[in-house]
Amino acid sequence: MPNITMGLKPDPVAPTNPTHHESNAAKEIRYRGVRKRPWGRYAAEIRDPVKKTRVWLGTFDTAQQAARAYDAAARDFRGVKAKTNFGVIVGSSPTQSSTVVDSPTAARFITPPHLELSLGGGGACRRKIPLVHPVYYYNMATYPKMTTCGVQSESETSSVVDFEGGAGKISPPLDLDLNLAPPAE
C-alpha cells in the first residue's frame, strides 16, 4: 500500500539551500491572529468565542501593531486567560515587577506602550455614524426686504447678488408632498 500523508501539499518550488529558507523564517516573526497581506500590510482578526464568528480588527502597517490589536481584543473576549502575543501587562503583578524588570529576558515580557488602535483602520465592533449637517431653509416671505442702506458700488468688477429675486415677484409656495403620488394631470 502506498504511503499517503494527509495535510499540506508540498511546495512545488522547494528551496535548494535549506539554510537560506530557515534564515528567512527566522527574520519574519509570526504573531497570533495576524496575517501578512501580499502588498505588505498586516491584517488582524480574532474569533469571537460566544458567536463563533471571526471579528475583523483592522489592517495595520506593522505586525506589532496588528498583534497589539489582537492582544487587546483577546483580553476583552477572554480576560486574564487570553493567549496573547506580548505576555502579561507590566504592573499587573506587583510581586514580579522588581524581578522581571531586572532580569535579562524582561524585554520579552514587557508590553509595548498602548497605541490608539481606532485610528489605524477601523474596528469591527464600531459602526461609523454619519454626520448630520444642518439644513437651513430661507423663506423670503417671512423676512423683511433687505436694504442697501445707501451703499452703492461704482466698480465694474464687483458682483451683485439679488436676494429678493426681483421686486414684488415672490411666487406662492407649492402645495407639494413628495411622500404622495404625483397629481393626475
Swiss-Prot record:
GO terms for biological process: ethylene-activated signaling pathway. One of its GO terms (molecular function) is transcription cis-regulatory region binding. It is found in: Nucleus. Involved in the regulation of gene expression by stress factors and by components of stress signal transduction pathways. Transcription factor that binds to the GCC-box pathogenesis-related promoter element. Acts as a transcriptional inhibitor and may regulate other AtERFs. One of its GO terms (cellular component) is nucleus. PROSITE patterns: AP2_ERF. A motif (EAR-like (transcriptional repression)) lies at residues 176-182. PANTHER family: AP2 DOMAIN CLASS TRANSCRIPTION FACTOR, ETHYLENE-RESPONSIVE TRANSCRIPTION FACTOR 8. SMART domains: AP2 (SM00380). Residues 1-26 are annotated as: Disordered. InterPro entries: AP2/ERF_dom, AP2/ERF_dom_sf, DNA-bd_dom_sf. Residues 30-87 bind DNA. This is Ethylene-responsive transcription factor 8. Transmembrane segments: none annotated. Pfam families: AP2 (PF00847). Belongs to the AP2/ERF transcription factor family. ERF subfamily. It comes from Arabidopsis thaliana. Keywords: DNA-binding, Ethylene signaling pathway, Nucleus, Repressor, Transcription, Transcription regulation. It comes from the Eukaryota. Contains a slightly degenerated ERF-associated amphiphilic repression (EAR) motif, which may be involved in the activity of transcriptional repression. The lineage of its organism: Eukaryota, Viridiplantae, Streptophyta, Embryophyta, Tracheophyta. The gene is ERF8.
